[in-house]
């Protein structure tokens, strides 16, 4: 999965289709993301010492990563994410629609000849 926390995404499927928000959490094992303001549910909380008031909490639930697309920073439209190697050997993410860089993933690897 190529999503990162704080990426701006748009929901492309489901009840919140069209909603824009930042990614708050990424679960790579389950292939799910939590998007700010999307997939909100009421969680009923029982009274306890930790929560003496009890009541209902409105919280975001995880959604499948396939239901969101990254928003291209230059155009503001949904785009796919690609990975490319730079000349110095480091990897970066880029928006496929515009080719704009989305930040470095990994630094250049050290040469194996040195070992």
Curated annotation (Swiss-Prot):
<feature type="region of interest" description="Disordered">
    <location>
        <begin position="45"/>
        <end position="77"/>
    </location>
</feature>
<comment type="similarity">
    <text>Belongs to the universal ribosomal protein uL24 family.</text>
</comment>
<comment type="function">
    <text>One of two assembly initiator proteins, it binds directly to the 5'-end of the 23S rRNA, where it nucleates assembly of the 50S subunit.</text>
</comment>
<keyword id="KW-0687">Ribonucleoprotein</keyword>
<dbReference type="InterPro" id="IPR041988">
    <property type="entry name" value="Ribosomal_uL24_KOW"/>
</dbReference>
<dbReference type="InterPro" id="IPR003256">
    <property type="entry name" value="Ribosomal_uL24"/>
</dbReference>
<dbReference type="Pfam" id="PF00467">
    <property type="entry name" value="KOW"/>
</dbReference>
<protein>
    <recommendedName>
        <fullName>Large ribosomal subunit protein uL24</fullName>
    </recommendedName>
</protein>
<dbReference type="Pfam" id="PF17136">
    <property type="entry name" value="ribosomal_L24"/>
</dbReference>
<feature type="region of interest" description="Disordered">
    <location>
        <begin position="96"/>
        <end position="115"/>
    </location>
</feature>
<keyword id="KW-0699">rRNA-binding</keyword>
<dbReference type="GO" id="GO:0019843">
    <property type="term" value="F:rRNA binding"/>
</dbReference>
<dbReference type="GO" id="GO:0022625">
    <property type="term" value="C:cytosolic large ribosomal subunit"/>
</dbReference>
<dbReference type="InterPro" id="IPR008991">
    <property type="entry name" value="Translation_prot_SH3-like_sf"/>
</dbReference>
<dbReference type="InterPro" id="IPR005825">
    <property type="entry name" value="Ribosomal_uL24_CS"/>
</dbReference>
<dbReference type="GO" id="GO:0003735">
    <property type="term" value="F:structural constituent of ribosome"/>
</dbReference>
<keyword id="KW-0694">RNA-binding</keyword>
<comment type="function">
    <text>One of the proteins that surrounds the polypeptide exit tunnel on the outside of the subunit.</text>
</comment>
<keyword id="KW-0689">Ribosomal protein</keyword>
<dbReference type="InterPro" id="IPR005824">
    <property type="entry name" value="KOW"/>
</dbReference>
<dbReference type="InterPro" id="IPR014722">
    <property type="entry name" value="Rib_uL2_dom2"/>
</dbReference>
<dbReference type="GO" id="GO:0006412">
    <property type="term" value="P:translation"/>
</dbReference>
<comment type="subunit">
    <text>Part of the 50S ribosomal subunit.</text>
</comment>
């Amino acid at each position: 999965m190529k999503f990162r926390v704080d990426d701006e995404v748009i929901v492309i499927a489901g009840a919140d289709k069209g909603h824009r928000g930042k990614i708050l959490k990424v679960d790579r094992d389950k292939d799910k993301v939590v998007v700010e303001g999307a997939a909100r549910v009421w969680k009923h909380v029982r009274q306890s010492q930790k929560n003496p008031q009890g009541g209902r909490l409105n919280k975001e639930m995880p959604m499948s990563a396939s239901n969101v697309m990254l928003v291209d920073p230059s155009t503001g439209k949904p785009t796919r994410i690609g990975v490319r190697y730079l000349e110095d050997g480091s990897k970066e993410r880029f928006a496929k629609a515009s080719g704009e860089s989305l930040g470095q993933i990994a630094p250049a690897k050290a040469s194996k000849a040195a070992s």
